[in-house]
Amino acid sequence: MKHEIKHDPAFRALTPKWHHGYRFQYEPAQKAHVVLYPEGMIKLNDSASLIGGLIDGERTIAAIIAELQREFPNIPELGMDVDDFMKVAKEKYWIDLV
């Protein structure tokens, strides 16, 4: 089933989890959070790091957005930013959406 990404309650009801073999962690040598995978590493920017840190296989996309909105209430496009991150992460096989 294909979901429309932006403002789609069905999409936001999905739960992201890191794809098998992929791991989110802080990498001191990079001074940044990264996604490690068998073939390499992806260095994340600050926004992606905040989102990635909330991916635990239990929170839905909507719950991640709600938590970030509590922390950053003055960012109206935050939900769309999270949607965009999830879309890219899914396309690049960093995460699975269940």
From Swiss-Prot:
A GO molecular-function descriptor: quinone binding
Q: Which GO terms describe its biological process?
A: pyrroloquinoline quinone biosynthetic process
Could you tell me which pathway this protein works in?
Answer: Cofactor biosynthesis; pyrroloquinoline quinone biosynthesis
**Keyword Glycosyltransferase included in the entry's annotation:** no
Has the keyword Cell membrane been applied to this entry? no
InterPro entries named in the record:
PQQD, PqqD_bac, PqqD_sf
- Which keywords are on file for this protein? PQQ biosynthesis
Q: Superkingdom, according to UniProt?
A: Bacteria
Entry's HAMAP family? PQQ_syn_PqqD
What is this protein for, i.e. what is its function? Functions as a PqqA binding protein and presents PqqA to PqqE, in the pyrroloquinoline quinone (PQQ) biosynthetic pathway.
Q: How would you summarize the oligomeric state and partners of this protein?
A: Monomer. Interacts with PqqE.
Q: Name the protein family.
A: Belongs to the PqqD family.
> Which protein are we looking at?
PqqA binding protein
